[in-house]
Amino acid sequence: MTSCQVAEDPIKKVAIFGGTHGNELTGVFLVKHWLENNTEIQRTGLEVKPFITNPRAVEKCTRYIDCDLNRVFDPENLGKRMSEDLPYEVRRAQEISRLFGPKDSEDSYDIIFDLHNTTSNMGCTLILEDSRNDFLIQMFHYIKTSLAPLPCYVYLIEHPSLKYATTRSIAKYPVGIEVGPQPQGVLRADILDQMRKMIKHALDFIHNFNEGKEFPPCAIEVYKIMEKVDYPRNESGEIAAIIHPKLQDQDWKPLHPGDPVFLTLDGKTIPLGGDCTVYPVFVNEAAYYEKKEAFAKTTKLTLNAKGIHSSLH
């Protein structure tokens, strides 16, 4: 073994979460299907558990009941004394942490795939929380290569103030899967097929790794979050301009200083400020209006991973 190779523990337990947001229907539909027939997600020697994370929100086809489940897996919320007064999603987070965590414990699941849809034109997106995770960089490289020529983007949310406490973060290896564009409360066959393929390739990678396949050093292109941009607002705090037509549906495309970003109702164009090119993501995402986020700025980086193999081989 050289210094470019790292031995990693084999993967034993994997969960696939759907319905973290109850109106993002691809994950809901796939997980419900796999709960009835799990043949396509089974791999030898691997426990793969499909799970509906927010059943009440799924039932009502809404993002959440009391608060966003994908933002409450922080120590404060997970440590609150259980009571009926707690928001439903905080109680649910504690249940999920007990079932699949707790984080950093011997009992926690090795990998959690959390399935999401976006109304933004983001295509196939993998969400990475740690830029130094050789195993996940290798997995994402495998998925991207397997999906080609279909593009698959990697969104790195590692940031001191913008990273959030995700549902999947209780696993050793948290993986967000985001596919769009798809309206809330709607199923599209093309989007479902893409998400299904992403999970297939991810499970194939895990199986190959567990069987002793060595993965040589690799590099992937990622888009790292820099800043969230709110809509222009008037004195009452109401939105005063909308996403400019030239920015709409242009996720992942370079956005230069001076390029149109917003358009007011009296026809005034508001351009991008600053002095550097950025790459916008979650452009005009429906769920982010309440979060005061018109889009997020990212910068493009290359991440390198050492070669990996299973410590059993």
Swiss-Prot record:
It catalyses: an N-acyl-L-aspartate + H2O = a carboxylate + L-aspartate; N-acetyl-L-aspartate + H2O = L-aspartate + acetate. Pfam families: AstE_AspA_cat, AstE_AspA_hybrid. Its EC number is 3.5.1.15. One of its GO terms (cellular component) is nucleus. GO terms for molecular function: aspartoacylase activity; hydrolase activity, acting on carbon-nitrogen (but not peptide) bonds, in linear amides; hydrolase activity, acting on ester bonds; metal ion binding. The keyword Chloroplast does not apply. Keywords: Cytoplasm, Hydrolase, Metal-binding, Nucleus, Zinc. N-acetyl-L-aspartate binds at R63, N70, R71, Y164, R168, Y288. Catalyzes the deacetylation of N-acetylaspartic acid (NAA) to produce acetate and L-aspartate. NAA occurs in high concentration in brain and its hydrolysis NAA plays a significant part in the maintenance of intact white matter. In other tissues it acts as a scavenger of NAA from body fluids. Belongs to the AspA/AstE family. Aspartoacylase subfamily. This is Aspartoacylase. It comes from Sus scrofa (Pig). The gene is ASPA.
